[in-house]
């Protein structure tokens, strides 16, 4: 009898482990993911993506982005690029875009926003991408590219939101978010 109980416990433990392993691999395979082709997470942005101001040598070309496995119920996306190292640690907003249709799963480098998408305001108060331009000689800055899957229709938000205003507007509408970090220095 004791042998049978021990064998049953071992089978139950093995079965539980298999279920857990299946659940973890299923979750990992279905996680909302963001990548930038050619730039691994933690990698360095090419100089073309840098700002054109202050002799940074760039052309303000947005990085290419791809995402997959948005959660069920996603109606639109929002993307921000934020440099937490900029402005002496207070941070710098480089890009705000929202109202991106749920059918969109990528943005080409330097490409036009998808039809209907809106540009928010960057650190300069412009509705545009502003490429990185950290002070010369500083350690490379980190640029957090974050995408939010939203339950909002693409046309739900007004044009010209700042990053803070966008965060306030989507606070109760984020289904999931994911990010990658890129670096740039000069």
Placement of each model-derived feature along the sequence:
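Bacterial N-terminal signal peptides that target proteins for export
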Residues: 2-13
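Bacterial N-terminal signal peptides
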Residues: 11-23
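N-terminus-centered regions that define maturation/targeting leaders and the start
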Residues: 27-186
